[in-house]
Amino acid sequence: TAIAAAEKLGRRWIGIDITHLSIALMKYRLGDMFDLKEKANYRVIGEPVDLAGARALAAKDGGDRYQFQWWALSLVRAKPLGGDGGKQGKKGSDKGIDGVISFTEGGTGRVQRALVQVKSGGVKSGDIRDLKGTLDRENAAIGLFITLEKPSKDMLTEATTAGFYKSPGWHMDYPRLQILTIEDLLTGKAPL
C-alpha cells in the first residue's frame, strides 16, 4: 500500500479509507512490516474505542452489519470470509463463518483454523449450537463467538459442551468454543 511505501521511505503519511476492512489491513501491514503499534506510533480516527462507539457502528446507516463485523474481526486479527467463490471479505452468504484465524499447531506443524462468528444484535443459545455444528462440519479446531451483547447463562453452558482443543505443542487444553464480548476485546481480553 501507499502507507507502507511511505513508511519504508521514512516519510510522514496520512491514510484514509472508507471501510473497516481496509483500515484493519493497513494496521496489520504497519505492525507486521515495521513493528508499529496503534496508539504508540500512530492513531486511527473513526474506529470505536468504547462500547458506545461499537453500538453506534452497529446501528450506523440502518445497521450496516458488515462494517461492524469487519471491525470486530480486526480485534482478533481474523481474516474476513464470505461472498461468492474466492471473494473473501465481501458481502454475501457465509455459511455461519464470518472470519478465520489460521494457526500452526505447535509440535506437529499442522495448520489449524479457528472460525469466528460476529453478532451485533440479539443473541441466544441457539447461536452457540449453530456455531458448534459449524465447527464440526468444517473440522475446525476452535470457534470464537464475538457478541456486542453479554452472553446468557444458557449460552455459556452451551459453549462448554463443545469440549476442548488439546494443543500438542503447548500441552494445554483450550475451550473449543469461546464467547467474547466486544467489551472484553476493547478492554484487552484475548481469546485463550
Region locations from a protein language model:
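Short, conserved active-site loop motifs that form the nucleotide-linked donor/cofactor pocket
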Residues: 177
